[in-house]
C-alpha cells in the first residue's frame, strides 16, 4: 500500500520534515512531480539538508528512493545533490520515463518571465514540460543509448535554431550541450531504471511506499490560482499518474499545512498580511525560499483554501506545521470566508481577484516550541487546533513545534 504526503497550500509547507520523520517506516520514498524549482529543508541531528530533487528518504540507509516519471530532471543539479551523499547504490532510482531539463529550457524560462512576470524560478521547469507535451522531449532513458541520445539532440538543435539568438544560447550551444551530457550522463546512468515496474511489483508484494509531492495544491496547473501556478499537477491524484500505481493502492493522504500561510512569487493571496506582523512571521518562521532564497509573502491561515485543498486531495489527516511561529502573538487571525463585491464566499473560486478575507480572531499563547505532547500545549493553542479540525473536517494527526525532527506531536 502507498501513502501520499501532499502540500495543501502554496508550497513550502514543511513536507520534507514530515517525510523525513516517517520515512523510516517505509520501504520506498518516491518524489512524484515537479523539478529542482522545489526545495525541502530537513534538520537532522542539528545539520540542515536542502534537497531539491532527491526524495527525503535519503537520510535513512534502508530506504529506497525513487524519482518518478512526472519529475523533470536537471542532470547537473541532481549530480550535485548525489555527490553530497554516500552509498546511494541500490538506494536511488530515477525513472527512465522522466524528462530531462536542458540548459535551453532555463534560457527560455528566463526570456518568457520578462514579459509574463509569473514569478517562476527560471529553472526551465515550464519549458521542459512544454516539450514533454509537444512530444519532443528527451527522457532519462535516452541517456542510456548514445545513438538515441544523438538523434534526439540533433532534432532538438534543428527545432531551436530560430530561437538561439533570442534565448541567448551562444554560438557554441551544440558543442557545449554535447559536452554537458558527456560530463553528467555517466554519473547519472547507473541510477536510471524502470521504476514503474519496480513500484508495481513492490505494491503487489505489500511493501510500504511513501509518495512525496512538491510545491502545493494551490499551485496545481489545472486546479490552482492560474496563471500563477507551477507547470505540473501537484495534487495526490498526480502520484498515481507519475508512479504507475493505481488509485486502489493509495491508503492515507496526509495534507501538510502551516499554522499560517505563505506564498512565493506573484499571484493572489487573500490572507496576506502586509503590516509588520507579516514581517514578524517571515523573520520568525525563516520564510525564505530553499531554492531561490526569495522572501516569502506571509499571512494568516486561510480555511477557505484549506478546505478546498483537502477536498481535492482526499486528505485523511493533516499535519500542522510551524505552530511555534505563532508563539507570543496576542491575537491570531484565521480567514473563514471571502468577501467579493458585497457577497460572502465560502467556496474557493477559480479566480481570487477582488476577494478580501473575513477573519475570526483567537487569543494567542506564550510558548509551544519544542512541545511533544498535546496536553503540554497551552489551552489557547489547543483551541486553535480544535477549531481548524472542526472547520476543515479532517483530523490533525501530527503537529510540528520546531524544525527538529523530534519536536513533533503525534495524535
Swiss-Prot record:
Where in the cell is the protein located? Cytoplasm
Gene Ontology molecular function: adenylosuccinate synthase activity; GTP binding; magnesium ion binding
* The keyword Iron belongs to this UniProt entry's keyword annotation: no
Q: What is its EC number?
A: 6.3.4.4
Cofactor comment in the record?
Binds 1 Mg(2+) ion per subunit.
Question: Mainly resides where?
Answer: cytoplasm
Keyword terms of this UniProt record: Cytoplasm, GTP-binding, Ligase, Magnesium, Metal-binding, Nucleotide-binding, Purine biosynthesis
Which residues are GTP-binding? 11-17, 39-41, 296, 322-324, 400-402
Q: Which GO terms describe its biological process?
A: 'de novo' AMP biosynthetic process; IMP metabolic process
Give the UniProt family note.
Answer: Belongs to the adenylosuccinate synthetase family.
| Descriptive protein name | Adenylosuccinate synthetase
Amino acid at each position: 500500500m502507498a501513502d501520499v504526503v501532499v502540500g495543501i497550500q502554496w508550497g513550502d509547507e514543511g513536507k520534507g520534515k514530515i517525510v523525513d520523520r516517517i520515512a523510516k517506516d517505509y520501504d520506498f520514498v518516491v518524489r512524484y512531480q515537479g523539478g529542482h524549482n522545489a526545495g525541502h529543508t530537513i534538520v537532522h541531528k542539528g545539520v540542515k539538508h536542502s534537497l531539491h530533487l532527491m526524495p527525503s528518504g535519503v537520510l535513512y540507509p534502508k530506504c529506497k528512493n525513487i524519482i518518478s516519471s512526472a519529475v523533470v530532471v536537471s542532470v547537473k543539479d541532481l549530480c550535485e545533490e548525489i555527490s553530497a551523499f554516500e552509498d546511494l547504490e541500490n538506494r536511488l532510482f530515477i525513472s527512465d520515463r522522466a524528462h530531462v531539463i536542458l540548459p535551453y529550457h532555463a534560457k527560455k524560462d528566463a526570456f518568457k518571465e520578462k514579459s509574463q512576470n509569473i514569478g517562476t524560478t527560471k529553472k526551465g521547469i515550464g519549458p521542459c514540460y512544454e516539450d514533454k507535451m509537444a512530444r519532443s522531449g528527451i527522457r532519462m532513458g535516452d541517456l542510456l543509448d548514445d545513438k538515441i541520445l544523438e538523434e534526439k539532440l540533433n532534432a532538438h538543435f534543428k527545432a531551436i535554431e530560430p530561437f538561439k539568438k533570442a534565448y541567448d544560447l551562444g554560438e557554441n550551444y551544440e558543442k557545449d550541450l554535447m559536452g554537458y551530457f558527456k560530463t553528467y550522463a555517466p554519473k547519472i546512468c547507473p541510477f536510471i531504471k524502470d521504476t514503474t515496474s519496480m513500484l508495481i511489483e513492490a505494491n503487489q508484494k505489500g511493501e510500504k511506499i511513501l509518495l512525496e509531492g512538491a510545491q502545493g495544491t494551490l499551485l496545481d496547473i489545472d486546479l490552482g490560482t492560474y496563471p500563477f501556478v507551477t507547470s505540473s499537477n501537484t495534487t495526490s491524484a498526480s502520484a498515481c499518474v507519475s508512479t504507475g500505481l493505481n488509485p486502489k493502492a493509495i491508503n492515507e493522504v496526509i495534507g501538510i499545512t502551516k499554522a499560517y500561510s505563505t506564498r512565493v512569487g506573484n499571484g493572489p493571496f487573500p490572507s496576506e498580511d502586509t503590516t509588520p506582523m507579516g514581517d514578524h512571521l517571515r523573520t520568525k518562521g525563516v520564510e525564505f525560499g530553499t531554492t531561490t532564497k526569495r522572501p516569502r509573502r506571509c499571512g494568516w491561515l486561510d480555511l477557505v483554501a484549506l478546505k478546498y485543498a483537502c477536498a481535492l486531495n482526499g486528505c485523511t489527516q493533516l499535519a500542522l506545521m510551524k505552530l511555534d511561529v505563532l508563539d507570543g502573538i496576542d491575537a491570531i487571525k484565521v480567514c473563514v470566508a471571502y468577501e467579493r463585491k458585497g457577497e460572502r464566499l465560502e467556496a474557493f473560486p477559480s479566480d481570487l481577484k477582488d476577494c478580501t478575507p473575513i477573519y475570526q480572531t483567537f487569543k494567542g499563547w506564550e510558548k509551544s516550541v519544542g512541545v511533544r505532547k498535546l496536553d503540554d500545549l497551552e489551552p489557547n493553542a489547543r483551541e486553535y487546533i480544535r477549531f481548524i479540525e472542526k472547520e476543515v473536517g479532517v483530523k490533525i494527526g501530527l503537529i510540528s513545534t520546531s524544525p527538529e525532527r523530534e519536536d513533533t506531536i503525534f495524535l
